[in-house]
Amino acid sequence: MDNKLIYNKAASLATASDRESYKEMNFIYKFIKRVLDIVCSILGIIVLSPILVIVSILIKLESKGPIIFKQLRAGKGSKPFYIYKFRSMKIETPNIATNDFTDSHVYITRIGKIIRKTSIDEIPQLFNILKGDMSIVGPRPVILEEVDLIELRKSYNIDKILPGITGWAQINGRDNIGNEEKVKYDYEYLMNKSFTMDL
């Protein structure tokens, strides 16, 4: 028998074995990550409940409108879902991406400035995690109007994972980097996702 054929067959079997091993490891990773997301979000809600109450009262006292701001974002599979945030802007604020604002200070409330600077406005997203719409770590979900970024993420399969409260692109630049740079970091996370990287 041709040694080359034997080698190719062995290589293909090894590849199949590697794929099965990867699938198993990926399943374990996703399962444990989901459990940790649920546990951490419940603990977070309990521990941060005094802040939730105080911020809710301050928002209601300062301006008209709901305490919680709901906005459609692109989630896993690019499917839209409502993300929750403490409302930090006036109700007449245009529905555009943060980095597209030229005069955002006009729309931000006084309490809004504080909760944005400290990222307290993101706390309600713990409920998104409980619902299964988000994870603690993952690519940040973008508004549906950011079509270019959504399509770019699709082309790299980044939309196959749950969006997160924080992600690799946020740590490496947040709104100070362009779409291509964001996708580069998100893709790097996708290809190397692990508990070590999540930490």
Predicted features and spans:
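Short, conserved beta-strand/loop elements in beta-sheet-dominated catalytic cores
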Residues: 113-135
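Cytosolic-biased juxtamembrane loops and peripheral soluble domains of multi-pass membrane proteins
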Residues: 25, 92-110, 114, 140-147
